[in-house]
Amino acid sequence: HKSFSGGMYDSRQPMPDFVHTVAQQIGLTNTGYVFYKMDTLDIMPTHVDHFETYERVFGVERNNTYRALIFMEDWKPGHYFEVAGVGKTNWKAGEYALWHADVPHAASNIGSSSRYTLQITGELVDGKSI
């Protein structure tokens, strides 16, 4: 097995234009993007992201840093996501989760097909709350 956490395609690479539209619809600004592929048996145990590079590059303080995870395809058996101790399954393509930088989260894939998501890191636009 090549990896325990999955494969990433991040903002250092060309991004499709739609990622900016998605970020605006969610209410995020000063955004960084990562497409994430989680193969069968990839796991990401419960953790809190550090966001040091994002916060340095964009000049954003941690208390203003948020992460959105957009599900690129409908849920498939064996795909799992958890944020703040609450598990999520049965999602539809386009649904998303949004959480503050200090919130623990986890993911795993024990299914027979890859799981694809888009991670967007950013600040909430003025007046937006979760």
Language-model features: where?
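Conserved metal-binding segment of the jelly-roll/cupin
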Residues: 89-105
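Signature of the catalytic double-stranded beta-helix
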Residues: 1-44, 50-56
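Short His-Asn-centered micro-motif
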Residues: 46-49, 72-73, 84, 99-102, ...
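Extracellular structured ligand-interaction cores
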Residues: 30-33, 41-43, 65-69, 76, ...
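Histidine-centered active-site/metal-ligand motif
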Residues: 47, 52, 61, 104-106
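Short conserved catalytic/interaction loops centered on acidic-Pro-aromatic/His motifs
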Residues: 79-83, 108-113
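A short beta-strand-loop-beta hairpin characteristic of the jelly-roll/cupin
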Residues: 65-92
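A short hydrophobic beta-strand segment most commonly corresponding to one strand
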Residues: 66-71, 96-98, 112-129
